[in-house]
Amino acid sequence: MAAARPALGRVLPGSSMLFLCDMQEKFRHVVYFRQIVSMAARMLKVARLLSVPTVLTEQYPQGLGPTVPELGAQGLQPYSKTCFSMVPAVQQELDARPQLRSVLLCGVETQACILQTALDLLDRGLQVHVVVDACTSRSQVDRLVALSRLRQSGAFLSTSEGLIFQLVGDATHPQFKEIQKLVKEPSPDSGLLGLFQDQNPLFR
């Protein structure tokens, strides 16, 4: 019997959603927070241009504050949660989209809410693309090990630019020029080179 074909991880606007996880005021001290928020904001702009549905969560906003304004998520109604996974809070959004195949995941913290959200989505048979330059943790050890754990569990590790080009698909797309302007904006250092260099054994 032929071996099962591995998932390719294709991302298409009509079968994808963008998840924005807990980028709130009280997390400003988290390492590379400003940088990953800027990349998540870029993903949100592209999602709006391509009509990709987007959901936004806030972890215990009474204590951790609202979503930071620089994300540009004004107009999105945040889902308040206490569970680390986003999935229980946004289950109705998932149920409303039977065509959904892929979730693009940005936010904080990688070892907690990002990991548990990804595991719940994978358990539902969805493909998960963790936007590595739009996720971070207070500890870079936690960030590194969480990314490795996500990969072991079947999530795809992708950069924002790689996913953006998958979503737009073709230079003749009517939104390509607007998206190209976003891609050409300088990308901040989100600390990833230090995690992946020197043949890190967690990513062999």
Curated annotation (Swiss-Prot):
GO terms for cellular component: cytoplasm; nucleus. The lineage of its organism: Eukaryota, Metazoa, Chordata, Craniata, Vertebrata. Disulfide bonds: none annotated. SUPFAM superfamilies: Isochorismatase-like hydrolases. Its main location: cytoplasm. Belongs to the isochorismatase family. It is found in: Cytoplasm; Nucleus. This is Isochorismatase domain-containing protein 2. The keyword Cytoplasm applies. Interacts with CDKN2A. Keywords: Cytoplasm, Nucleus. Pfam families: Isochorismatase (PF00857). InterPro entries: Isochorismatase-like_dom, Isochorismatase-like_sf, Isochorismatase_domain.
